[in-house]
Amino acid sequence: MFKSDPTENWTAKDFYKEASNALYSGEFESAIKNLETLEARFPFDPYAKQAQLDIAYSYYKFDEPDAAISAADRFMRLNPRDPNIDYVYYLKGLVNFKRGTGILDGWFPRDQAEHETETLHNSFNDFATLVRRYPDSKYAGDAYQRMIYLRNELAQHEIKVAEYYLSRKAWMGALNRAKIVVERYEHSIWRKRALEIMVIAYNELALPDLAADTQRVLDLNQDVASNLVNFDTELEKPPESSWYKFW
């Protein structure tokens, strides 16, 4: 004899209330289960759209970044004009920020390092989209500060690789990596070191004119003040739509 389902007669509101209680209690797996069941049983209920947003957040809190990104992308695809799209961009940026930062704390195999920098680029791009499209968003200020941080992280990665090439006397490799910092991350705190590496590489490659030109730029270069901030990767629960309350 089959056991009856205790949620058989639940409404969308019941599932959402249960999921919200689980979220606030830190029971993210339970929250995900209830939210996904809600959406599956009541796909056209107003609570279903809120559930889609909360699913992305719940996966983020459950340390499932791929699932969080997938859920966030799905929400934007299904609700392109939703007033909470700025939050979704912020969530996506934060997911990749959380899993991408720290790559420069040590050495990693080349493929892994490049994958992690791609993650940081994705985070930067999501924050940039948020700042550009929603400059008045409550998340824009923090997103902009994270962009500054990410720019310096990405520049530092290139410097580390350039330094490695210098140690191996691979002058062209060092030069190319340093150029990336100067050209892509002009305002990063690593620009001065990049110019120094370029001077070394040009001299070793017997290109004295280019070395002299770069040295002149270096002499005029002003140190960029460090603007690194220790970020808390916590994120508040998604905003609830104003057109309903379940309490």
Residue ranges and their predicted role:
Residues 1-247:
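Acidic, polar-rich low-complexity tracts and alpha-helical solenoid repeat scaffolds
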